[in-house]
Design a protein with these regions (language model features):
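Core catalytic alpha/beta fold that binds nucleotide/phospho-ligands
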Residues: 1-121
Length: 121
């Protein structure tokens, strides 16, 4: 799981161009204002939620995970080293200025027993 406060920052588009997959960076660059900001944070939190769930965190390349950037369509579109169909991704929006995501490997969940992996910072 990852949750971030939606805060305008100078270099978000540059970060997307350097770190995200080309299609994600293009989708963010095609937007303006609040829409671009929300798309960036949707992308970031979805990637980070997945990478935390795998146990690699931000040590793995961000462009190896391709996600949707739209508010209403959380999805893992492709993975460099895994099957995107093996993952469930949900958007989390606890407040207007917070965007987040939860990623769960579907095979880790057995009738009433979700596998939980706690990561410390």
């Amino acid at each position: 799981m990852d949750v971030e406060r939606v805060v305008p920052r100078k270099y978000l588009e540059r970060i997307a161009a350097r770190r995200f997959a080309p299609e994600e960076a293009a989708a963010i660059a095609d937007r303006r204002g609040e829409s671009a900001l929300r798309a960036f944070y949707n992308c970031w939190t979805r990637k980070e939620a997945y990478l935390k769930a795998t146990g690699t965190g931000l040590t793995a390349p961000l462009d190896g995970v391709v996600v949707s950037v739209d508010d209403k369509r959380p999805a893992i579109l492709s993975l460099r080293d895994d099957d995107p169909g093996a993952w469930f991704l949900a958007a989390v929006a606890p407040a207007r200025d917070l965007i987040g995501a939860v990623a769960v490997r579907l095979g880790d969940y057995r009738a009433g027993e979700p596998a939980v992996r706690l990561l410390t910072a």
